[in-house]
Amino acid sequence: MQYSIFGQKFLKQTGIGQLMDDLSNPPPGSCLLGGGNPAFIPELIEIWREIVSKQIESGSIDKILGGYESPSGILELRETVASILSDESGTKISKDQIAITNGSQNAFYFLLNFFSGNFGNDQRKKYLFPILPEYIGYTDQTLEPDSFLSFVPEIREIEDRYYKYFISLENFDSIPSWKKEAGCICVSRPTNPTGNVITDQELEFLIERANNVGIPLLVDNAYGFPFPNVVFGKNSFIHRSGMIQGFSLSKLGLPGVRTGFVVGDSETITLLHRANSVINLTSANPGQFIALDLFRSGRWKELCEKIILPFYLKKSIFTQEAILNNWSSQIDYKIHQSEGAFFFGFGLGIYLYPLAIFIRF
């Protein structure tokens, strides 16, 4: 069979494809840690059952399963999400700045291709990772090869056994070519797979640098603000002009419904609506209606703060204590400061800087 360049891209395995295959077909005898799959938290499962039971009892399940919604998503849900993000960020956000997608993976496929690749007139742009390591799922999303740039991080050792990645601010001045090559800046917060959270100051720096050259800053909040809010420190949710941010129901405990949200400028949001209609016709209904019930009731905030965040923080503390108390002092290791998400990174000996090993707790 002969395939186009696009088809040939999938003749070989991709990084995220390998990860997802491992989740569904783990090698015999392996300990399945689940990648980014959220834990089955009993209190959350009870809430999902309650919401779906109401849909069945009221008969609304018939419309949910049997009809198409608009490619832009349920209007009331967009209004509700806009209200939540406005309250959390202190910035006025309207429904016209909200898109509903089939998960954040789907959203970033569109966004990364909107802002990288062929811009016409022999001009090509790439997306810039201002800090590494970064989410492996970004690297194979673009239609064109060789589509991303990256800056190495500044690594600071913290106490005896800890370290943390920081954005190396100097890179933005010492490597000026990024200003012409980059079509956008992209970062996840918290970061998959390190559990690193770029600081509010770092985020403000990226906003300023992106605005200075007229490109958007893409922020993936799949594990972060305001839901599921798996952030252990005192960072905050920030939204400014020039930012495009993604959110997901997956890490709330609903990866199977494939529902995500994007907030950005109204023009980019319109592009997302139109792209969604071409690729997906519309976004899946079940996740939208579950989210509408959860967000409209206001229960989402208590769920994040009192159930989800404490659950994963406890896991993080347990993992750190297990390593510190049980690993031999003769092992040359350092733990990446655990700041959020479901991941835990540590480096071994001379491989601390170029290579870290990541586990899910």
Regions found by a protein language model. Give the residues of each.
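Conserved C-terminal alpha-helix-loop-beta "cap" of PLP-dependent enzymes
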Residues: 343-361
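Short helix-loop capping/hinge motifs at secondary-structure junctions, enriched
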Residues: 266-271, 300-301, 351-352
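Generic structural signal for small/hydrophobic residues in well-ordered secondary structure
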Residues: 33, 81, 98, 128, ...
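Conserved core of the PLP fold type I
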Residues: 63-213, 218-240, 244
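Conserved glycine-rich beta-strand-loop-beta hairpin in the small C-terminal domain of fold type I
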Residues: 34, 308-320, 332-348
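Active-site PLP attachment segment
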Residues: 234-274, 283-286
